C-alpha cells in the first residue's frame, strides 16, 4: 500500500474486511474459517496496518499476526494513509472500525438500516473514546438502474436473476429509473452517508444506464 501511495502521489486508500465469500477463499487456496476467527483476524490486521502506516515501528503479538519492531519504509506520502473497514457486524466489525478505521463502508443497506448501523458505530466510538468525526461514513450500493422505464425493466430482470431470493438481507440497490435513483441518493444523504460507492457486478454493462447515471444522478451527489 505504501508503494501505491507513492505511485499515486498520496492518493492511496486501504480497504479491508472480515471476508464473507467462501469461493474467494477457495480460489486462492485459503481455508475459510468461522465468523469469530475472521473477526479476530480483522481486528489484529487492522491494528497491525494502523501501526505500520502511522508509527515508525510496529509491535503486535496476536493469534494470527505478529510484528516485532517492524518498520514500514519508505513511509507513506500521506501523513495518515486512510484505513477503511467494510462491513456491518454490530458486535465485532463496527467495534474494530471504531478503534482503527479512518473510514467505514457498509455494503448493500437501505437508508434506514444504514442509519441504524451508523448509530451503532457512534455508540462504539463513545464507549472507546474515539471521535466519531474522525471516521468517514459511506455506503456500497448495487447498480441496477435503467436509463428509462424499459431499461429499468431489463435491469430489474438482471437484479432478480443475480440475487433472487438469496439476498442475505441486502437491500441497498440503485434500481428503477434515474429519478428513483436520485431519490435514493437523497435518502442516504439525509441519514448521514457522506459518499456512495457504486458496485458494478458482472457484465455486460448497460452503457446507456451508466451515461444516464452520470448525467442525471451524479449531480445530486455534489
Name what the model sees in each region.
Residues 1-222:
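Active-site-adjacent structural elements that line small-molecule/cofactor binding pockets in enzymes
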